[in-house]
Amino acid sequence: MKRPLEMAHDFLAEVVNQDDIVVDATMGNGHDTLFLAKLAKQVYAFDIQEQALEKTQERLNQARMTNAQLILQGHETLDQFVTEAKAGIFNLGYLPSADKSVITQPQTTIEALEKLCHLLVKGGRIAIMIYYGHEGGDLERDAVLDFVSQLNQQEYTAAIYRTLNQVNNPPFLVMIEKLERYRHG
């Protein structure tokens, strides 16, 4: 059985190609940025921590990837850099090996999700990995689930991929796809 992060990558890889612009809304250590850079024409990656940019740039350099723009700003500013996107990924929570008090916040995450949903091309997808075992994580989890569950079903399909028998708040995946055409009925 695939782990949620593997499923997230597969979900995006099904639709992203070398002509596409994509977003890594939470750069972190750069694993998703590198994954997307190997698939897409251009990656816009966001984080508010300098350490994230440094680690990501190092990872990209080692792989000789030059098609990622690393942006030291919150993901809620993505519309200042991106006019349309084929896909996006969020890893919500905190940067491993960094200050665990610096966490993604419900307000800015929802703002970023709203903007990315609007900028998605038809057939585009968003993968949201939700880590919620830390203080404040449950609030963000609930805000994201509330936002996604209210997306217009004529425009989007949304699903959850999660393990049911794991303890200690296992991370789970929320998937959004912008429909190719409106469905009626």
Range-by-range predicted roles:
Residues 42-47:
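Conserved SAM-binding motif I beta-strand of class I
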Residues 29-40:
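Conserved SAM-binding loop of SAM-dependent methyltransferases across substrates and taxa
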Residues 137-185:
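Class I S-adenosyl-L-methionine
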Residues 17, 65, 120-122:
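Helix-to-beta-strand junctions that scaffold the AdoMet/dcAdoMet cofactor pocket
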Residues 1-21, 54-84:
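S-adenosyl-L-methionine
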Residues 93-111:
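Mobile active-site "lid"/loop adjacent to the S-adenosyl-L-methionine
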